[in-house]
């Protein structure tokens, strides 16, 4: 082995295998580009992005870690989302969930966020 060399197994690596996925059409209604990172809770993205927010609770973009998707002003594109795994607790982001995804009904903040996004 050479120092710094990376040896990988033959074949393809299957990412997010067996997890629920969702395709959603997303429109940027704002006047600025919006970029969403690979692990951002999609439900809590910028309110200028219009899509079925309720359906995306507990999902993130199904893209490689460390990458992002950019939505230009006026652009509509379909993205694939994948369900969070593990404990499924979400903290931070826009502060709309702040806890376990499976035990908490949509919070008042989340409902307000959703209403603001639809206005």
Curated annotation (Swiss-Prot):
GO biological process, one term: urea catabolic process
GO terms under cellular component: urease complex
Pathway: Nitrogen metabolism; urea degradation; CO(2) and NH(3) from urea (urease route): step 1/1
Major enzyme class: hydrolase
Pfam family, one: Urease_beta
Entry EC number(s): 3.5.1.5
Record key words, sorted: Cytoplasm, Hydrolase
Major place of residence: cytoplasm
Compartment annotation: Cytoplasm
Superkingdom of origin: Bacteria
Reactions catalysed, as given in the entry: urea + 2 H2O + H(+) = hydrogencarbonate + 2 NH4(+)
GO molecular function (one): urease activity
Keyword Cytoplasm: yes
InterPro entries documented for this protein: Urease_beta-like (IPR002019), Urease_betasu_sf (IPR036461), Urease_subunit (IPR050069)
Family: Belongs to the urease beta subunit family.
HAMAP family, alphabetized: Urease_beta
Quaternary structure and partners: Heterotrimer of UreA (gamma), UreB (beta) and UreC (alpha) subunits. Three heterotrimers associate to form the active enzyme.
Cross-referenced NCBIfam families: PRK13203.1 (NF009682), urease_beta (TIGR00192)
Name of the molecule in the record: Urease subunit beta
Organism annotation: Tolumonas auensis (strain DSM 9187 / NBRC 110442 / TA 4)
Gene: ureB
